[in-house]
């Protein structure tokens, strides 16, 4: 909602997921430690002054082709760069934004690694976005559909918590996503006679 994170000085990075449609007025204003903002492709409306007073803001990375805003002048912090996917260059040509650059947006993402573990175990999944060499291929969010079964951190580390199945999904700022099923099963008994 409006002013949702206003003056949150501990916030250094945000990733607006691909289900959010609107960023309300002054949502992040006054977040003086905010350095990077990644705005998913589903966002279609951005209200005024969302980054007003964000004096540490370095990068605003958009994942889509159209955002309903007239300008980002209230984010004109010296040295802030605004990135948009190069495949949408025509749609971005009418925006008047200082330090605007295109980037090669991920078109697909894959998850690899062990997809089964015993309760209490830690394993790491690897996320790979393509095409290779994209500036923001390493920017994604990982989610577990059932964190009571297994939780996942931003670096891909899964902690198996309880017997069951969960879906692990990786989302990129450009809207690409991939999922794998992760199973937590008890260790098999050994040395049974």
Where do the language-model regions lie?
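Consensus positions within tandem repeat domains that build extended binding/scaffold surfaces
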Residues: 1-4, 24-27, 47-50
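Hydrophobic aliphatic residue packing
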Residues: 14-16, 20-23, 37-39, 43-46, ...
């Amino acid at each position: 909602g409006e002013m949702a994170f206003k003056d949150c000085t501990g916030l250094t990075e945000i990733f607006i997921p691909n289900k959010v449609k609107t960023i309300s007025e002054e949502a992040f204003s006054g977040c003086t430690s905010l350095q990077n903002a990644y705005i998913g492709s589903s966002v279609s409306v951005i209200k005024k002054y969302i980054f007003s007073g964000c004096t540490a803001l370095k990068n605003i990375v958009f994942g889509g082709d159209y955002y309903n805003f007239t300008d980002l002048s209230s984010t004109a912090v010296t040295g802030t760069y605004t990135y948009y996917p190069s495949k949408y260059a025509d749609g971005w040509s009418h925006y008047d934004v200082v330090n605007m650059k295109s980037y090669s947006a991920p078109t697909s993402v894959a998850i690899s690694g062990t997809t089964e573990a015993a309760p209490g175990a830690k394993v790491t999944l690897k996320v790979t976005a393509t095409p290779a060499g994209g500036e923001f291929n390493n920017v994604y969010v990982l989610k577990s559909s059932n964190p009571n079964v297994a939780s996942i951190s931003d670096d891909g580390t899964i902690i198996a918590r309880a017997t069951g199945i969960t879906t692990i999904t990786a989302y990129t700022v450009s809207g690409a996503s991939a999922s794998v099923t992760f199973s937590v099963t008890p260790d098999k008994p050994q040395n049974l006679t």
